[in-house]
Amino acid sequence: KLRFRDLELVKEELQFFLDHNVPQVKFVDRTFNCKHDHAMAIWKYLIAHDNGITNFHFEVAADLLNEEEIALIRTMRPGMIQLEIGVQSTNPDTIREIHRKMDFAQVSETRVQEGHNVHQHLDLIAGLPYEDYDSFGKSFCDVYRLRPQQLQLGFLKVLKGSFMYQAAPEYGCVCQSREPYE
């Protein structure tokens, strides 16, 4: 079950960062924009209280961004936010197997950066189930065609308690028992 932090508390915390000219604040929950009203309230607050310095990094599900959210994002000053989009893979079998939901066709249609004010980086992960050399190459080309400012390649981390941790023996995964769990 998803929990959402009280908006008034979030605004107080954000104001602290803004008042202290913190260079960057990261929201590292990929479900940030799963609740439209919550995301919009935070983004509107940031626009209204922008200090011209602080950059906010959001992990978002691009296939969930709607036109109202995209329109609001396009009003932000250049450099105010950056979006990280965890594609992981464009192989539907892989996405299904790792219990993710993502509509890559919808991600491809989402045109946040047409406003030229948002830095976007898209992530891929090497080593996922059903992802071989050719499949990963296709995922890379699919994401590269979207022309993000940054394409980040990560290696599979098998975190304790995760689906991949439990399924590691089935896939023959060998990983470190200590950080970074690669």
Regions found by a protein language model. Give the residues of each.
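Residue-level detector of anion-binding/catalytic polar loops
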Residues: P23-Q24, H119, Q149
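Radical SAM [4Fe-4S] cluster-binding motif and immediate context
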Residues: K1-E114
